[in-house]
Amino acid sequence: MSGKDQSREITIVGGTYRETCYWPVWDELYGSGWRAVRVIRAFFPDVKIKFHTAGGSDVKQLLKVYAASEKLEYEVTELPDTISFYYNHPLSSPIMHGCPSTMVDMNASGQYVVGFGMLEAQTMINGDWVVYDPQSPRNPLSFREQGGKAAHLALVLNETEARKLSGEMELDAVKTALFEREQCECLIVKCGAKGALVYTSKDDDGKVIPVFKSSHVFPIGSGDVFTTVFAHCWFCGNKPTDAALIASKAAAAYCEERGIVDNIPEQVKDNGYKEHTPLKKGLVYLAGPFFTLDEKLFVSECRNMLQGMGAQVFSPYHDVGEGKAEDVVPKDIEKLRACACVFAIVDGLDSGTLFEVGFAVALGKKVVAYVENETEGALKMLEGTGCDIEKDFTTAVYKTCWYAAE
């Protein structure tokens, strides 16, 4: 990093929420705001932090204990209960509990401010250098319409938030509307597995910032890490594109480690992650049994998650259906020949699925085999023929989408 003094004071505004995931198991008190505090502390230990958040008694106790040993000032707007999010898996839409019926007002000011949209509060931010992430695909709130003031404003949004906030659909129109309405000098639109686009003016065509591949993917909170690291790097005088590149590597390190650990800054500096550069939109063949209700539900979940990541998916269950072998098999084989890669549900060692895997391997296709319960011996042929064997569902989905785009 370069430029200004890195031991500055940063004000962070954002939620502190309970996050519970059933598979893989995750039960932590985090949320965007508190995660940002932890990220700043891990990456930039000399920075003083002022933290504005809201929550119940558990949040107050957490911050009291943490502040006793760290450079942290905090202010908690008290709520009856801390908001909780429950995920079936990291790619699923969470169920939310504890959100108050009315929003509270929160004010925060400072020379350098990282602000996250909050479910329970409208935040009015006043700062010289401000990074704002609305954090709400359903109802993103405008920085300026909340009364926010900033001499230098950067917006970080995903595609859905950018379209909702701007009222436009095409990215060129989105960009123009947000620069004009929000009076920002930098706009970052996160595009999932395709990376992010960084704009520095409404006439800018945008610079693509790649996603970096990790061997394990735990995405809950990765967007918070990206925004926070980008903010500090930008505050330090880095160009927006350079700051976003560092932030993308930091997000990959977080996904790899499944949390904020001491060695994340070293991982980012070592630059051990490969860029994912989408070159095409290849077809994913979804192989798996669909004889019982639970099998049909899981095949549908896999299809939905892959499509949600932007993949084109052929599913024999959804696209051909059940029928006589002479009717369905030729159609399946045709798509196996045409696909870029295969996502295979291997638990249960279904004979049809194993045939599809073997056929794909013989054709030189990439195969990601998602399996939780089978023995190493049962998977020997898959392992020996170069299939990616994954026990983590989210990682399997990400790897499949990466292969499909190569």
Per-range role (PLM):
Residues 134-206:
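Conserved phosphate/ATP/ADP-binding segment of small-molecule kinases
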Residues 3-12, 16-27, 37-129, 272-278:
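Conserved N-terminal subdomain of the carbohydrate kinase-like
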Residues 3-8, 173-281:
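Conserved phosphate-binding/catalytic region of the ribokinase-like
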Residues 65-80, 252-308, 316-321:
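Charged C-terminal helix
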Residues 140-147, 372-384:
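Short, glycine/polar-rich helix-capping loops at beta-to-alpha or helix-loop-helix junctions
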Residues 321-344, 352-356:
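TIR-domain catalytic/interaction hotspot
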Residues 348-369:
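Amphipathic helical hotspot of TIR/SEFIR-family domains
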Residues 74-78, 385-400:
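Short acidic-hydrophobic, aromatic-tinged amphipathic segments that line or gate anion-handling sites
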